[in-house]
């Protein structure tokens, strides 16, 4: 096994079935790349990423655990977000929530 390798059955797989998702267009206005991991609270990402932060509150990237999305300088891309589950308590990141969503 290779670290990070996904071993799955054949066929199509759906991540986070039954959970609310949101599609957003995100623009990197910085002069450097910005990378966001799978479980980072998307509303608290680097301020140089331009998107509707209020809409992204309580959500993360809808990608496989441990994966990340990289935004190159000036790049605009569409991402899908998914609601955090469980107790929906967020600590850390940029310190903007520090508690229940």
UniProtKB/Swiss-Prot annotation:
List the InterPro entries hit by this protein, alphabetically: Urease_beta-like, Urease_betasu_sf, Urease_subunit
* Entry-linked SUPFAM superfamilies: Urease, beta-subunit
Could you name the Gene Ontology cellular component terms for this entry? urease complex
Q: What molecular functions are annotated in GO for this chain?
A: urease activity
Please give the superkingdom of this protein's source. Answer: Bacteria
User: Which reactions does this protein catalyse?
Assistant: urea + 2 H2O + H(+) = hydrogencarbonate + 2 NH4(+)
Q: What is its EC number?
A: 3.5.1.5
Can you say where in the cell this protein is located?
Cytoplasm
The primary site where this protein sits is cytoplasm
Query: What pathway does the UniProt record associate with this protein?
Result: Nitrogen metabolism; urea degradation; CO(2) and NH(3) from urea (urease route): step 1/1
The enzyme class is hydrolase
Q: Which UniProt keywords apply?
A: Cytoplasm, Hydrolase
GO BP terms, alphabetized: urea catabolic process
Q: Does the keyword Cytoplasm apply?
A: yes
In which family does this protein belong, per the annotation?
Belongs to the urease beta subunit family.
Q: How does it assemble?
A: Heterotrimer of UreA (gamma), UreB (beta) and UreC (alpha) subunits. Three heterotrimers associate to form the active enzyme.
Its protein name is Urease subunit beta
The protein's organism comes out as: Variovorax paradoxus (strain S110)
Q: Which gene encodes it?
A: ureB
């Amino acid at each position: 096994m290779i670290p990070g390798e996904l071993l799955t059955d054949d066929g199509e797989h759906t991540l986070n079935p039954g959970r609310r998702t949101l599609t957003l267009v995100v623009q990197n206005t910085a002069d450097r790349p910005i990378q966001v991991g799978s479980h980072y609270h998307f509303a608290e990402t680097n301020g140089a990423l331009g998107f509707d932060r209020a809409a992204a509150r309580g959500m993360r990237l809808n990608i496989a655990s441990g994966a990340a999305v990289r935004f190159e300088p000036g790049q605009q891309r569409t991402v899908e977000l998914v609601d955090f589950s469980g107790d929906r308590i967020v600590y850390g990141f940029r310190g903007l929530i520090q508690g229940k969503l």
